[in-house]
Amino acid sequence: MGTDIGDLLLKDTIEIAGLSNKVVAIDAYNTLYQFLSIIRQRDGTPLKDSRGQITSHLSGILYRLTSLIEAGVKPIFVFDGKPPDFKSDTLAKRHEVRESATAKWEDAKAQGLEEEAYKYAQASSKVTREMIDDSVRLLELMGIPYVKAPSEGEAQASYMVQKGDADYIGSQDYDSFLFGAPQVVRNLTITGKRKLPKKNIYVDVKPEVLSLVDSLGELGITRQQLIDIAMCVGTDYNTGLENIGPKRALKLVKEHGDIKVVLKELGKDIEDLDAKRDFFMNPPVTDDYELKWIKPDRAGVIDLLCKKHDFSEERVNKALDRLEANIGGSQSTLDQWF
C-alpha cells in the first residue's frame, strides 16, 4: 500500500512523550490494517470471539488508543469514503494478494511452520465493512472523535492538518505527503519491541516524525515534483515504471522538471496521468466534522466488547479506568482536551 518514497524523506525519531497535547488525525484504514496484521497468535491466527468473529482491530483500538491518550496524545480517526475510479486496479490486485497469502498461511500452519505462517497471515489481513462499523461504534463509546472522508482518508487528514485542526497525520504510508500533509508521524500505534523477520532479534520501534517542508527543501523539489517522483515509482493509482526506484526517479524529475517530460524521454505512458496528478493536488475533502473528546460510555463499551465479542470484563474495565482518568475525570483534566 502507498508509495515507496520513504528513503528520500527526512525522519526524526522521537519519544511518545514528545507528542503530548498534540492532535493526531489517524488514517483509520491504515491503522486498522496494522492492528489486524500485528495482533495475532504465534501461528498468525487473529483474535476471535466465540462466534469466530475477528476482534484484533477492536483490541487495538481499546488498548493502544488508551495508551496514547495516557501519553497525552489526542487521536482522531479518519475513515475512507469512496475511492477514485482509477484505484480499482490496485484494489483488485490487493484482493489477489490476500487470497494467495491466505492459501500460503493455511499451508504453512498445516506444516507447523509458525514463522512462515505468521508472515503470510499478516499479508492476508482484510478490513471489512463490519469491522469498520464496529470500530466506529467503539470510538463513539470511548468518546474519541472520528471523521468520514468523502474519498481518501489520508487526503482528508492532510487537509485537517493544513487547516490547523490537527498537528500530525498518523499513518505508515507516505501518500500523505502527496496530498500535502505538513507533518506525519509513523509507528504511532505499533511502538514497542518488534521481532525482525527470520531472526531472533528484537528492535525498539519508536515514533518517527516527518516534515514535508523539510524534506522538499532537502531534496530541492516542489510538492508537485514529489508527486511525479511517486508516480514514477508507483502509487495506489498507477504501477511504477520498470527499473525506476526512488533515487533514479528523483534524478529524472530534477533533470527534466516534471513527469511528462520523463515519460516522453523514456517512451512510457501512465493512463489518466493528468487526472491522477490533479487528484493528489486537489482531492475531495470536507469541513463537516466536529472534534470533541468526551467521557467514555462504560456500559456501552462493556456491552459491545464483553457481551458481544467476549472480551474480559476485568481487562476492559481497567482500560476504561485509565481512559476516564485522562479524558473523563475532573473538569481540569477535561479542559486540557479542548
Swiss-Prot record:
Pfam family, one: XPG_N
Xref: InterPro entries: 5-3_exonuclease_C_sf, Flap_endonuc, Flap_endonuc_arc, HhH2, PIN-like_dom_sf, XPG-I_dom, XPG/Rad2, XPG_CS
Family as reported in the entry's similarity comment: Belongs to the XPG/RAD2 endonuclease family. FEN1 subfamily.
Gene Ontology terms describing biological process: DNA repair; DNA replication, removal of RNA primer
SMART domains given in the database record: HhH2, XPGI, XPGN
Subunit structure: Interacts with PCNA. PCNA stimulates the nuclease activity without altering cleavage specificity.
Top-rank EC class of the record's enzyme: hydrolase
Reported function: Structure-specific nuclease with 5'-flap endonuclease and 5'-3' exonuclease activities involved in DNA replication and repair. During DNA replication, cleaves the 5'-overhanging flap structure that is generated by displacement synthesis when DNA polymerase encounters the 5'-end of a downstream Okazaki fragment. Binds the unpaired 3'-DNA end and kinks the DNA to facilitate 5' cleavage specificity. Cleaves one nucleotide into the double-stranded DNA from the junction in flap DNA, leaving a nick for ligation. Also involved in the base excision repair (BER) pathway.
EC number: 3.1.-.-
Keyword Cytoplasm: no
CDD domains reported in the protein's UniProt record: H3TH_FEN1-Arc, PIN_FEN1
Region (I-domain): 116-257
Region feature Interaction with PCNA, mapped onto this chain: 330-338
PROSITE patterns: XPG_1
Protein origin, superkingdom: Archaea
Record's cofactor remark: Binds 2 magnesium ions per subunit. They probably participate in the reaction catalyzed by the enzyme. May bind an additional third magnesium ion after substrate binding.
N-domain, as annotated region: 1-98
Organism listed in the record: Methanococcoides burtonii (strain DSM 6242 / NBRC 107633 / OCM 468 / ACE-M)
Protein keywords: DNA damage, DNA repair, DNA replication, Endonuclease, Exonuclease, Hydrolase, Magnesium, Metal-binding, Nuclease
Record-given protein name: Flap endonuclease 1
MF (Gene Ontology): 5'-3' exonuclease activity; 5'-flap endonuclease activity; DNA binding; magnesium ion binding
Record: residues binding Mg(2+) 2: 173, 175, 236
